[in-house]
Amino acid sequence: MMKELFRKRSIHVCVVNTGGCNGCDIEIVACLAPRYDIEQYGIYVHNNPREADVLLVTGPVTLQWAERLKEIYEKTPEPKIVVAVGACALSGGIFKEGHVVGGVDKVIPVDAKIPGCPPRPSEIIETILKVAPKAIAMREKRLKNKDE
């Protein structure tokens, strides 16, 4: 009961790196630092897609990661909000001529896109906050149905 009360007012994010240079991942880590402190906005990072409201996907989707990304997406509860972070996640970026499928939207549906190489931490936070209401509304609906 207490866990659900706290979850109701927060947004839980799972970061998935599907290849690339890790530049976007470094910017996501910067979001956790005191300068940005995403937890002040009620945003928490998890490594379990089953706990996530939002998937933040970085890097181009490599051939090795395509099926794994689909599996992770399927494990994520509804509404399965996906945010593609950075140029590589949008189009394959500088890796598009390599062994990649392309951007994230070639493999799973994408709800929001953050351009940049890498994007600024503030852009990442703003985008998560823009998609948060949809995730929170869906979670509340699930909880209400569970109680009935």
UniProtKB/Swiss-Prot annotation:
The alphabetized UniProt keywords are: 4Fe-4S, Iron, Iron-sulfur, Metal-binding
Zinc-finger is among the record's keywords? no
Query: Which positions does UniProt annotate for [4Fe-4S] cluster binding?
Result: 21, 24, 88, 117
PANTHER family per the UniProt record, alphabetical: FORMATE HYDROGENLYASE SUBUNIT 7-RELATED (PTHR42989:SF1), HYDROGENASE-4 COMPONENT I (PTHR42989)
Q: Does the keyword Metal-binding apply?
A: yes
Q: Which organism is it from?
A: Methanocaldococcus jannaschii (strain ATCC 43067 / DSM 2661 / JAL-1 / JCM 10045 / NBRC 100440)
Task: Output the Gene Ontology terms for molecular function.
Answer: 4 iron, 4 sulfur cluster binding; metal ion binding; NADH dehydrogenase (ubiquinone) activity; quinone binding
Question: Which protein is depicted?
Answer: Uncharacterized protein MJ0516
Cofactor detail note: Binds 1 [4Fe-4S] cluster.
Q: Which family does it belong to?
A: Belongs to the complex I 20 kDa subunit family.
State the source organism's domain of life: Archaea
Q: What is one Pfam family matched by this protein?
A: Oxidored_q6
**What cofactor does this protein call for?**
[4Fe-4S] cluster
